[in-house]
Amino acid sequence: MTNEKMIFRNRVVDKGQLRNLISWAFTHYGTARTAVMADKLKDLGFRYATRAGVSISVDDLMVPPSKRSLLEAAEEEIRATEVRYQRGEITEVERFQKVIDTWNGTSEALKDEVVTHFKQTNPLNSVYMMAFSGARGNISQVRQLVGMRGLMADPQGEIIDLPIKTNFREGLTVTEYIISSYGARKGLVDTALRTADSGYLTRRLVDVSQDVIIREIDCGTTRGIPVRPMTEGSKTLIKLSTRLLGRVVGEDVIHPKTKEVIAPRNTPISDDLAKEIEKAGVAEVVVRSPLTCEAARSVCQHCYGWSLAHAKMVDLGEAVGIIAAQSIGEPGTQLTMRTFHTGGVFTGEVAQQVRSKMDGTIKLPRKLRTRTHRTRHGEDALFVESNGIMILEPRKEGSETPAPQEIHVTQGSTIYIVDGQQVKKGQLLAEVALGGRTTRTNTEKAVKDVASDLAGEVKFAEVVPEQKTDRQGNTTTTAARGGLIWILSGEVYNLPPGAELVVKNGDRVETNGVLAETKLTTIHGGVVRLPEATPGKSTREIEIITASVVLDQATVTVQSSQGRNNYLITTGNNQVFNLRATPGTKVQNGQVVAELIDDRYRTTTGGFLKFAGVEVQKKGKAKLGYEVVQGGTLLWIPEETHEVNKDISLLLVEDGQYVEAGTEVVKDIFCQNSGVVEVTQKNDILREVVVKPGELLMVDDPEAVIGRDNTLLQPGEELLGQVATELRYIQYVESPEGPALLSRPVVEFAVPSNPDVPSTTSVSQQTGRSIQMRAVQRLPYKDSERVKSVEGVELLRTQLVLEIEQEGEQEHNASPLAADIELIPDLEDADVQRLQLVILESLVLRRDIAADATQGSTQTSLEVKDGDTIVPGSVVARTQILSKEGGIVRGVQKGSEAVRRCLVLRHSDMATLNISAKPKVKAGDLIVAGTELAPGIFAEESGQIVGVKNAGESTTTQDAALSTQNYAVTIRAGRPYRVSPGAVLQIEDGDLVQRGDNLVLLVFERAKTGDIIQGLPRIEELLEARKPKEACILAKRGGEVKVVYGDGDEAIAIKVIESNGVVTDYPLGPGQNLAMPDGSVVPAGQPLSDGPSNPHEILEVFFSLGSEDGVYACASHALQKVQTFLVNEVQMVYQSQGIDIADKHIEVIVRQMTNKVRIDDGGDTTMLPGELVELRQVEQVNEAMAITGGARAQYTPVLLGITKASLNTDSFISAASFQETTRVLTEAAIEGKSDWLRGLKENVIIGRLIPAGTGYNTYDEPGMLEDYSTLETTSVLDETDDPLDMVLDDRTARAYNLDSPGLAETGFNNRRSILDDDELIADEIHDLVEAEVEVDDEVDDDYEDDDEDDDDYED
């Protein structure tokens, strides 16, 4: 070690410095020693952290004292804006934007204030030290602790214009706390969604690039890609030196001034060289890149450059594809997912503010093209249409005049001063829109509704409404011209439906005067019944009985069983009915009220029903039964049916056998009647057993009796020698004893045509509906229906049905009529209850609401008493609407259908000023606050002048000259609202509005934040090569732009005129804005409108341009354009989030997306149209064709997204393990594909050693490599006696030939053994082994050669 003095550098080593230090150590001294150094640094850090004991206490959070004044200034500005809004100078949207921008500005200013405050007062403050050394926390967190939290977005992404003014040190108010938790929740949800997305992206990336391995040293290509610094507007995002670091020069780099070669071709660019190139001012450098590498299915060392992990040339066999995929996928989590549609708020960053550097005068040159323009804060400004300059002439300072300053303004900038205006130092002159991409920030249409702040009548001033009808026939009214909408104050009353006004325009009403009244009338008339007003609730309902029916002879008794009440009705002739509808409920027309209880029609078993003379109504639901129309007889043939589902083995009787009652027919089932058994079975499963009672008559000749099957035998008829005494039913059966006839008994039930109805008395209004009870008989079964049952069934039911006659009622009541069932005590005998059915018309009285301000107070009076009989159409009650305050009635529209609102102009709505001077205003003028009414007198509030009276008229003429005149000016309060052109009007001139009614929908454009789809979704869109939603229009050929304007000043189309005079038209869709001004010259592929470009279209445009050098050159050129586009766009997204990724990683991925072409025509090759083949492969085949004279294959380059590319890879094993396994494998099997196992994934799946790293060359010929030590940079190991030197680095060890000399030969160094061969193997067999090894090698060689040939053939 030399005796030089140590140099002490007085610097703070922050995170960045530390990073550089460690990377330097790593590059020069290798991993092991760096690890030791890092350890020592760690110990140092911990030791001093322990000594210092830096921690945060609440006292460390120092709030800058200037915070108060900053907030006050902001509030002041907002108050001023509010006043402008009140005066109708700006719209609601402009006010909102201004408020938000003000708060954002304040928040930023406060942040800077926090920093300076810490620096000046206490640089050793622990909070400050932590945040600014990069140890913990960052400035935005500190801002929340000691500055202000700022604005938050609500769940819809709209910004809430109430900022959080406090910080966590001072504590949040409840409102602020809740607003603040909105944003926090959003962050959490976002993160949760992000991790999954990012993981999937990484998986797809790995899959597409896993087989990219460095396999050659130099592919020998002369192509390269130009590298420039990456800029956005005037801001450099990535410096040239950063982009060059670790690349290999593709063409000699020449110094622009001295013309000497700084770096010859194939030089790796180190850090120093990169800085030197940048210093020399070289604009762009052509470097070799994975995009242009010509190695087959891999990338060569020279095209890849340094492995960024060690800052050395990349090793052969390095799996650069996987590294690239991980480098792009890993930061994915840090990208924000959802864009906060924050109402165009964060676009404050977009514009750079130009402030005056000194006092002076501004001159705008004549040739500067500007137009007046209203800014988003509602201020007037000039909009610059083409690039130019403005001149600032400084004020004269003494004798010498400083030179005037030129200020450059770009197209799209906004100038805030006018020609010749005096400006002060620091005054805002202009906002320059950043050049380049941001001029095409997308805008989107958004709407905001404006609600009225006061009730009153609407008056349009300067607003020109315009009606549009869309295809659906909906009309919308929009403002063709902007202007003011005035709301002139007054009390607006909402009239209830059906109210009639009793006043007219201009009438004067006193307090509690009647404005309108509603009448409650009855439609049908009848007997009034007022339900008893229970103490708690007043009488709201009036019932009018229009019709009723009473069962006057029947008594009602109640039986309770199991907690349910059964009502039984006993009629005069002792029929008992069961009430089916409980009292107090409503009964519809045709509903059953009661059912007769009788057992006359009950059977004992199931059986078979036949009608004799009985007729039923055909229609009707089977559920309710069939109504009997004509009486007659029901014939019932009993039979007993057992439905069983059991195995046939459980049957104990035979089909056709005669059994006695009580026989067990099936296991556990006994029959109840004697008779013949009929068994139904299906698939050895017993379905049902039927026992048919009757007598069995054996037959000798079946033919003779077959006609008697299923017939009735009348009494007195003879059958087989027997005379029947009663009606029998004959059936033919096959019994076990032989053929027989079964004679079955028949039961008859008589059905009367008209059942008797209990006597009723009914009351009915002459106009109303009549109501009566009708008895109906219903049969539940059809003719010839079999009733399967063991127990008995009821064959006929007699029911009482309610019938309401509806005559001409349809228009009043669409609802079906209903009657109420009530029990009323009998008039003579109070103990007996009678059943009464009534039809009520029930009228509800309006409650008198004092609370609803818009309705005025109401007063309701009842016009009838209980028990009155009234005629239809009489008034039952009337409600009057009273005015709350006296005033004049206005705003009753004449001739309009029903008037729903009316306005009372109160005294409090008007103010009178007494003025001595002559007023400058006249009646009817609309004035805003601050207008001069008379010399020296200004209006305090906005409104309309109602009258100007001359009060001081003197009586005598000679005094007239002396007396001063007095004027009384009366102003009616009002409120103006500014409406921007194109807003949707929701009211008309002269309408009456309540407070809070919507007046207009303001339509405004807001900038979509950034490139709207930032972050992961945008990266995914690029890498999956999706077509963007609103893509821009690309110029297909170069030329001069001519803009075609439509009937507005809207651009509707763009014409591009080429140099040879060809004109191409590009129509602009809705929502597309010009990106190129009129007259500019554009190259092919240049976006003409705003929006993201469609990469497929870029490829198509450049490919269709064609080229003299044939289709291959053309395809390569087009692919290179789209590759550059993709690399830059992906970089943009990551840069916008402050994430640095080396270009080469993105290039490796993009290379995999762009190396295929689609065959259009196979020519004489073996390729089929539509097949996806690698570009280089087609080109080789085409070259072969050119030699043999065959027709070449025609193709189009394609861009595949990463998923598509993964599925189209050569290796089907890799593709199948990714997605759509069955499809990939079946296709591979049909095509008979072979997998050459070139990538990592295939080998992992099969279980071989992967061909990367140490496994590289395991399956390749060993002789390819030159000796490693020639590639090795010289080591910087110092010859010191430091114990650290015992540590050898894994990468520098090769330079020190530590292995036995025999093994340092070429070809073996990639398989270094740890121990010497001699130590492993005993001496005798050593020679033998040596010989064998050589043989192995040869075998290997041959095999590998084969493989190589295959390779070539495949290429």
From Swiss-Prot:
Cofactor(s) this protein requires: Zn(2+)
Organism superkingdom: Bacteria
GO MF annotation, one: DNA binding
Record's keyword annotation contains Transcription: yes
The enzyme's E.C. designation: 2.7.7.6
Transmembrane annotation, as ranges: none
Region Disordered, residue ranges: 1331-1355
Swiss-Prot/TrEMBL catalytic activity: RNA(n) + a ribonucleoside 5'-triphosphate = RNA(n+1) + diphosphate
CDD domains associated with the record: RNAP_beta'_C
Cofactor mode of binding and number, as noted: Binds 1 Zn(2+) ion per subunit.
Signal peptide stretch: none
Top-level enzyme category: transferase
GO terms for biological process, alphabetical: DNA-templated transcription
A single cellular component GO annotation: DNA-directed RNA polymerase complex
Keywords associated with the record: DNA-directed RNA polymerase, Metal-binding, Nucleotidyltransferase, Transcription, Transferase, Zinc
Pfam families, per database record: RNA_pol_Rpb1_3, RNA_pol_Rpb1_4, RNA_pol_Rpb1_5
Binding-site positions, Zn(2+): 219, 293, 300, 303
Functional note: DNA-dependent RNA polymerase catalyzes the transcription of DNA into RNA using the four ribonucleoside triphosphates as substrates.
HAMAP family assigned: RNApol_bact_RpoC2
Family of the protein in this entry: Belongs to the RNA polymerase beta' chain family. RpoC2 subfamily.
Oligomeric and partner information: In cyanobacteria the RNAP catalytic core is composed of 2 alpha, 1 beta, 1 beta', 1 gamma and 1 omega subunit. When a sigma factor is associated with the core the holoenzyme is formed, which can initiate transcription.
Protein name in UniProt: DNA-directed RNA polymerase subunit beta'
Organism: Nostoc sp. (strain PCC 7120 / SAG 25.82 / UTEX 2576)
